[in-house]
């Protein structure tokens, strides 16, 4: 069964659109919503396991220019 993670993302001033666009091209990212609240974007990642989710976060999401902070929540049951 795939592992699903919800990533709350804070983007730099004026970078929300660029970050959201970049996220949409990341393999494993299945949804990107721009939101209002303490975070600017919520993205959903679906991957084979926790290691694969970690790879997406470390090697793709955190390297997007304009990402300043993230909070990741792992789904336990759907």
Where are these regions (language model features)?
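A compositional/biophysical signature of low hydrophobicity enriched in polar/charged and small residues
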Residues: 1-78
């Amino acid at each position: 069964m795939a592992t699903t993670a919800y990533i709350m993302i804070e983007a730099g001033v004026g970078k929300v659109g660029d970050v959201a666009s970049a996220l949409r091209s990341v393999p494993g990212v299945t949804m990107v919503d721009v939101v209002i609240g303490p975070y600017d974007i919520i993205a959903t990642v679906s991957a084979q396991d926790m290691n694969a989710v970690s790879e997406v976060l470390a090697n793709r999401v955190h390297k997007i220019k304009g990402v300043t902070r993230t909070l990741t929540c792992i789904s336990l049951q759907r």
